[in-house]
């Protein structure tokens, strides 16, 4: 294992499709890999799936898309779509276990950024796409939710779609 550092800066109307995975395993020198992602000028990341590999996140194994630092400047992340059958029911393969997770180990900044997320509007523990930021957040980001079959319900704590472990 060799730690590497990658920075991806997109420009006008760039489209990324798929999953992103950064291995945070610490190598023999005490370093881990970094992937800094900056989406700018109407760029889009279509997060079509969770990365198939699992990573350690806050001491526990987690499955999802992993980046180190993330910034959205007039750009959008679309947390994929869920498929329905002809009876307006979720296909079995598209149920709660297939919602997307985005882990940002470091900091997140938004400058007119957008997140398009899927959520079942129901109780506190409703299935949802999630974004978890290990560091700090700053700026302005708009979140668009698509209700995936939820009929609404009383919540005590709300449905957690974004969690920030640092300052916000």
Predicted feature locations:
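Extracellular beta-solenoid/beta-roll
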Residues: 1-140, 146-147, 151-168
């Amino acid at each position: 294992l060799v730690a590497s550092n990658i920075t991806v800066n997109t420009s006008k109307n760039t489209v990324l499709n798929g999953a992103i995975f950064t291995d945070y395993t610490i190598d023999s020198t005490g370093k881990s890999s970094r992937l800094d992602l900056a989406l700018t000028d109407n760029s889009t990341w279509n997060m079509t799936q969770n990365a198939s590999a699992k990573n350690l996140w806050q001491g526990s194994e987690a499955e999802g898309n992993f980046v180190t630092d993330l910034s959205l400047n007039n750009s959008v992340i679309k947390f994929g779509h869920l498929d329905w059958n002809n009876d307006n029911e979720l296909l079995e393969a598209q149920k709660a276990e297939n919602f997307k997770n985005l882990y940002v180990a470091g900091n997140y900044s938004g400058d007119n950024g957008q997140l398009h997320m899927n959520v079942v509007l129901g109780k506190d523990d409703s299935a949802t796409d999630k974004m978890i930021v290990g560091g700090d957040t700053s700026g302005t980001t708009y979140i668009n939710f698509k209700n995936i079959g939820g009929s609404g319900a009383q919540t005590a704590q709300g449905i957690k779609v974004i969690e920030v472990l640092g300052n916000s």
